[in-house]
């Protein structure tokens, strides 16, 4: 369970020095710091459940979400998340894993996000179409649809059969919010598959 320093200090208020007690408990592995002011009580909590608490507003996307949905064959160990108007990439290394955050356009940010629950944890993750749009937004403009198709199938290793399952209408609707030639080309490419 995620707890703030204030919550833990309140729980430890009967001790003479709650801050010292918290520090000792963290050193003994009873609490695990996620970032300054935030702790997790269970060392075995999957990293993706913590991503939204580290930096936000954010949601899981890019390679991690594509792997989550089985679009790309590789396992992704860094939890990749989308943010907006932060102006720079952020990276956090914790005992739970590595977390990276990067911007997408603010108009695109609220589109295509799912809120999921796992036990007592809630987390936000991009729908598969949105994760692919976010991923392509980070790529330098590709010259044509053929190069885009090669990028999708060779670099990202997405099977053509998986591309055909995507909701083309959603991607075409999302493309207006990104102002990205790659996403416009993806819309056009998917209409022809």
Residues covered by each model-derived region:
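Exposed, interaction-prone assembly regions rather than primary DNA-binding/catalytic cores
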Residues: 70-127
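Short, compositionally biased low-complexity segments
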Residues: 25, 33-35, 102-109, 147, ...
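Residues at alpha-helix termini
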Residues: 27-28, 67-68, 177
């Amino acid at each position: 369970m995620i707890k703030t320093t204030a919550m833990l200090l309140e729980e430890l208020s009967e001790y003479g020095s709650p801050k010292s007690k918290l520090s000792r408990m963290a050193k003994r592995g009873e609490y695990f710091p996620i970032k300054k002011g935030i702790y997790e009580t269970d060392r075995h909590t999957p990293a993706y459940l913590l991503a939204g608490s580290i930096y936000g507003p954010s949601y899981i996307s890019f390679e991690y979400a594509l792997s989550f949905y089985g679009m790309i064959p590789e396992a992704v160990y860094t939890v990749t998340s989308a943010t907006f108007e932060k102006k720079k990439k952020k990276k956090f290394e914790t005992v739970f894993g590595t977390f990276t955050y990067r911007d997408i356009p603010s108009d695109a940010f609220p589109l295509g996000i799912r809120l999921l629950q796992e036990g007592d944890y809630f987390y936000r993750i991009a729908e598969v179409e949105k994760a692919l749009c976010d991923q392509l937004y980070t790529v330098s403009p590709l010259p044509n649809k053929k190069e885009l198709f090669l990028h999708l199938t060779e670099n990202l290793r997405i099977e053509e059969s998986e591309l055909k399952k995507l909701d083309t209408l959603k991607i075409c609707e999302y493309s207006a919010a990104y102002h990205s030639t790659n996403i416009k080309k993806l819309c056009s490419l998917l209409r022809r598959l």
